[in-house]
């Protein structure tokens, strides 16, 4: 569960984002909401009064960032356009990071929490060359 500073604002943000990613709002209890894509749940909840006094800072105890794994580079590109079209903060545009096999877009939620959508295709192992000589 992710604690958020302004539940109403964050719910609008995450509802748009998660619906785009194929999730549906399944649960809502007061200041908590949960979405599902049939495989996993993603929850947000209002931070308590003490927590709302502090701003998210990457490097503090807690999440560094949260990543969603997508099915293809095209899906990452589509999300990048969706983020821009909806005025969401893009930190790093769709591109290759950490090498050619890692393709991602980085963006921020209303509290500045860093989010990522990525596809990682590990390199395929090289197959041994076929011998031109017949075995007897």
Go through the PLM ranges and name each one.
Residues 50-56:
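Short beta-strand/turn micro-motifs at beta-sheet edges
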Residues 4-9, 67-110:
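Vicinal oxygen chelate
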Residues 114:
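Glycine-rich acetyl-CoA-binding "A-motif" of GNAT/NAT acetyltransferases
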Residues 1-11, 66, 121-136:
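N-terminal beta-strand motif that seeds the catalytic metal site of vicinal oxygen chelate
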Residues 48, 117-124:
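Short beta->alpha transition motifs characteristic of CBS
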Residues 3-47:
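Core segments of cupin and vicinal oxygen chelate
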Residues 61-65:
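Short, solvent-exposed beta-strand edge segments and adjacent coil->beta transition regions
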